[in-house]
């Protein structure tokens, strides 16, 4: 079965949805997503999206914070572009229906680790869910977008793959996609293909990523011949809830931004010996500090304490975190929360330029799956949603212009060849291998 469109979008987080909404004004869009359309890392993002807004803040300050967090290997031109497009990104999201939290007649900006100013737009502590809600609503209302849920991309369709010759120009014509419920592989042909499949947190034993973040977008691009870079830079979020019944529940960095303090089991604060910003140090610093404290004292976790703040403020500012912790009989207004680091964000990925182009013609990559140069070795808090939305706009403008100025035709595309392999009757073998890989990656990550 072949499905043709002008644009094929793989992924339904802020990157894919933002691109689809803009591309749909220029042509037909097919959007595929592994599970339900809302099952993305965006939907789980709590903290917010960073952008210069107040008169006390500047683009230079935001850029400097970004490059310091990135350990000096950020691409300065990309940092400058993304930071300066921040206000327009916020404006566009608001126009699409995103309701950011306000205070009086302005927006309630918060601060997170590594930021020198309050510049984080948020929707309580469910910012990602609010963004996803607004964008999904707009996507379903657009007549030029067709959404295919429970569809998993398997391989890109490229000219080299078809011709079986490395010397031919490597162009992308779409992807082979598994219809999970129908148990068949479909051929999605498109003039422009956008990869926005997210990260690879599920490669690690402990992660705050959803199950769909398994890294297959990077793997597909690698098999197709795209350039991949900086895969060693996996960011670990410092504070996920340490509880046997809590599945990878993240405690937002904005909790520390509002005054929470990291403590040892005996109540001693420890971040002052690791960084001058103490609990507001960049994520990599805080995560390593927590890991070191756990190893030094033989503890399974450390504690995040915000009990010195007004209980009503805590409940109002962090309603989702407060309610979720109560389910596990933890009252953050009265007791510190046990927390540990977990795999959170892939700073490397598929190499893409300032317009989202990869090294394969007509294949674009944006969002967490891409390495754009913004984050360097370590992402600054709340820069991911900003990057995804900014690059969605740039990729749309560049790719839509290509549609206008170039002639497109599809060669004869062979049907998917499933080969002679058969499904294993013993799924426990797959599960065991997957578990061993995740344990190995976690062990290696902690060792370094």
Describe the residue ranges of each PLM region.
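A glycine-rich dinucleotide-binding beta-alpha-beta segment and adjacent secondary-structure elements
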Residues: 149, 154-171, 178, 317-370
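An anion/pyrophosphate-binding glycine-rich loop and adjacent beta-alpha core
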Residues: 37, 220, 226-331, 335-337, ...
